[in-house]
């Protein structure tokens, strides 16, 4: 399935779609650079592309972690990406009050995994009329996400999608149960695999979340093989210098070779 977005018709091919970008808006130049490069890659490969970057990061390990360059400035940069490059925008919200404001720019409002049970937040996002992407909590079963989907639909918005981002495995690790895609697709909505956050290693004593970016290709290949509708990847030209989530990002230079491999898998299973 493909997300229904006004102004962005569904593709005529059967490729998966891609949600990708940096974790957070770091500045105008680098954000536009990343968006432009991903767009060029996806245009060449005929992959539908949605640009994702948070305009603020509310859920951080440490009080001293980077949270953003300023809400208004970050949203203005996302608007520039949207208008200059004609790319649909995905960004996350954390409170009901952010929904209407972020919806002025975003085409898809993303609900963070830790907040996927927050009824008021889901309803507020739904009432904007924008597509709502709910990330499955690390503590939630695939089957239980039906309730989150129903909250959005019963608020009057049929445009909803789900994202798998791993399940807590002990104190400092996550695993992906690939059986879950079938259960989530039974909600008759697009289901996405987050190939980078599902490889996080949270709760580190340092206060900085770790990750296994060396396994991004493994997770992505498995996700395409089992039939996820879309893939989510955070990427950056220099992940070690990224201001958020650098430990589990895909280097931007590795994106195109990976997508080429994934398209071959997609073609083989259709």
Per-segment meaning from a language model:
Residues 1-18, 76, 267-270:
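N-terminal amphipathic alpha-helix/helix-capping segment at the start of soluble metabolic enzymes
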Residues 15-19, 48-52, 88-90, 107-108, ...:
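Structural preference for beta-strand elements that scaffold enzyme active sites
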Residues 18, 22-31, 49-71, 236-245:
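Glycine-rich, proline-tolerant flexible connector loops at the mouths of alpha/beta enzymes
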Residues 22, 51-55, 91-93, 113, ...:
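A cross-domain feature marking catalytic cores of carbohydrate-active enzymes
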Residues 37-40, 44-45, 64-90, 125-131, ...:
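Alpha-helix-loop-beta-strand connector modules within alpha/beta enzyme cores
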Residues 64-72, 108-115, 171-178, 199-224, ...:
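Active-site-adjacent loop and "lid" segments of alpha/beta metabolic enzymes
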Residues 69-70, 84-98, 107-120, 131-142, ...:
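Catalytic beta/alpha-barrel core
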Residues 129, 133-235:
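Catalytic alpha/beta core domains of metabolic enzymes, predominantly
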